[in-house]
Amino acid sequence: DGLVPSEGAAALVLKRLSDVEPGEKVYGIIRGSGLSNDGRRKGLLAPAADGQADAMQLALESGAIDPLTIQYLECHATGTSVGDGVEVSSIRSVYADLEHLPVGSLKANTGHLITVAGLASVLKLTGAMAQETLPPTPVDGEILEQLQNSNLKVQSSRAAWKTEGGPRRAAISNFGFGGNNAHLILEQYQPSSRPGRNKAFKQCPAPD
């Protein structure tokens, strides 16, 4: 019940999908991303549902993603009743048409990694996709009131990540001090996801 700060480090190697070589190991694809800032609306530490929803909507639009194809959402979820309640409200406004959306947060396992919180969630979900498993979030105590009787359900146990023919696809939210909001659409890599390379392009040596 409340923010539990912790420390950690994480790193990713990013590469354009068109530059992926045959047989190269790819852990996931960033299909869409959205950023917003609502810091002027309330205050440094006060979140705003509409600002968070803006970032979510931008991420979906940037990747031309149908929200109905999102199969799991990794929440920011600092563990405060006010902040988590606002986040649930923003998620429900954007993903309202989903009949059932599993949600969770790495912070229940590690605490709040502050500057690494979002990146750690990306690592968590790429690993979950590789294992074809919905990752569990430990639940201890009463479920947040705003989650009850909603389409959002905390994924409290390990389960097979089933799909209906398409790739595994998830969303990640990460919010910072001062009203900075980020939302990412992550997709499991499949060889068919890789676009064809432009064979007409050739690297030329730099002039002496």
Can you annotate each of these PLM segments?
Residues 1-208:
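Condensing-enzyme catalytic core of the thiolase-fold
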